[in-house]
Regions:
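Conserved, structured core segments of small domains
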Residues: 1-101
Length: 101
C-alpha cells in the first residue's frame, strides 16, 4: 500500500483553478481500483491519497500525472507501507469523520 502526499507550492487560487482536472484524475484512479481514500490536509496545504496495487515505481508514475503536479502547483511524495492491521469498522469511521473545510 502507499500514501501519496501532495504539498501545494502555489497559492490556493491557482490550486482551485486546477481542481476540476484534479477531480477527474482522482475519479479515473478510483475507477481503476488504485485509490482507496483521499482528501485534503488540514490546514489546506495539500492532500493525502491512500493507494494500492502495483510497484512503487508505478504508483510514483501515477502520482506524477496529477494535474496539480504536472502544472507545477504541488510536490508529491510516495510512502510505501505494509498494512498489517485495520479497524473492522473502517468504513463507518470514515463516514462519521466530521467535515472540516
Amino acid at each position: 500500500m502507499f500514501i501519496i502526499e501532495l504539498t501545494y507550492t502555489a497559492p490556493l487560487d491557482r490550486i482551485d483553478a486546477q481542481m476540476k482536472a484534479h477531480m477527474q484524475y482522482l475519479r479515473k484512479q478510483y475507477a481503476s481500483g488504485r485509490f482507496l481514500v483521499s482528501g485534503r490536509k488540514i490546514p489546506r496545504d495539500g492532500g493525502i491519497i491512500i493507494a494500492t496495487g502495483g510497484t512503487r515505481e508505478e504508483v510514483e508514475a501515477i502520482a506524477k500525472q496529477d494535474p496539480f503536479v504536472t502544472s507545477g502547483l504541488a510536490e508529491v511524495r510516495v510512502i510505501e507501507f505494509r498494512a498489517s492491521q485495520k479497524a473492522a469498522d473502517i468504513q463507518q469511521r470514515i463516514e462519521a469523520e466530521p467535515s472540516r473545510s
